Amino acid sequence: MPTAFPEDSVGLVSPQVFRFSEPLALACGRSLAEYELVVETYGELNAARSNAVLICHALSGHHHAAGYHSPNDRKPGWWDSCIGPGKPIDTNKFFVVSLNNLGGCNGSTGPSSANPATGKPYGADFPVMTVEDWVHSQARLADVLGIEQWAAVIGGSLGGMQALQWSISYPERVRHCLAIASAPKLSAQNIAFNEVARQAILTDPEFHGGHFQERGVIPKRGLMLARMVGHITYLSDDAMGEKFGRGLKSEKLNYDFHSVEFQVESYLRYQGEEFSGRFDANTYLLMTKALDYFDPAAAHDGDLARTLAVAKADFCLMSFTTDWRFSPARSREIVDALTAAKKNVCYLEIDAPQGHDAFLMPIPRYLQAFGSYMKRIEV
């Protein structure tokens, strides 16, 4: 537990709540009459309001991207390795905004929030969200903050999809777009993984059609299984082999179906158990559907270059060699489309054994490349 924070930490941070009363029309045909977004900021907004950077989170992410909420916190925010003084997203230079998206379960309005119409948790009645919906809500947040244009919009995985959507939906409001370990749309295999995870939740007897909160229960087993499946896809075979191999938890096999015998089994069960205690099942369903639905090129008969033709930002794409969830080939699809659309783009394929989760890790080559690009951004 830190008693003094590292010099390159943003230190103690406090979330802010922004309330919106103007209805937000959604892609599903419904709307949210009112909603709240939980936000953290790091660094200072300059007088010209030209140094603001938006951080978009991935599936299980949230607003707490850097720093500590308490001196007793065991861990900093989820992207602390990249945000702070002297780090790639340098808070001595940039004013950084990070939020929990609508539909999340970390304070922003979502399935676990009270439905104003009933006074009960929304549960399964919360509307399905899309990446476009999130970007529109983020644009409203920017308006409230007085930010007309982002110096950069940055995200990894699902966050990278939001960054791309920003460049399409609000081309005048983004100077640089950084999409890391991302994709222009999900493959059939990725949709399949998400469906297996959803079925694990939907078929849990404690799910109760999404209204489990009213019964005082949670679909723990379903969430555990969903997280276990997802976590396998976030790591590479090499990373799992190096970390666990075929190591046993105890010295011998038990020859039964109930014991936790292999170290990798123990790890997955721990991850599932921890996740099911902090994440909302309806939010998990919602986030995976937003991933599945993301396909901006569909508006132009699948032509991604035509879709990106409206963008005015400069782009930086990064991928990792062992990421098989969003492989380098998926980032190259975006690069090829941007090149065809005659946009400024740089692409970095980073040799890293960690798989998809590499974008969250303090890999020196990655941090150096990331920081080099961010230094080019004028504020």
Curated annotation (Swiss-Prot):
Compartment list: Cytoplasm
Active site per UniProt: 157 (nucleophile), 323, 356
A Pfam family of this chain: Abhydrolase_1
InterPro entries according to UniProt: AB_hydrolase_1 (IPR000073), AB_hydrolase_fold (IPR029058), HAT_MetX-like (IPR008220)
Record-listed E.C. numbers: 2.3.1.46
Metabolic or biological pathway: Amino-acid biosynthesis; L-methionine biosynthesis via de novo pathway; O-succinyl-L-homoserine from L-homoserine: step 1/1
Reaction catalysed by this enzyme: L-homoserine + succinyl-CoA = O-succinyl-L-homoserine + CoA
Enzyme class: transferase
Binding site for substrate: 227, 357
UniProt keyword Cytoplasm, yes or no: yes
Protein role: Transfers a succinyl group from succinyl-CoA to L-homoserine, forming succinyl-L-homoserine.
The protein, known as: Homoserine O-succinyltransferase
Lineage: Bacteria, Pseudomonadati, Pseudomonadota, Gammaproteobacteria, Pseudomonadales
Gene: metXS
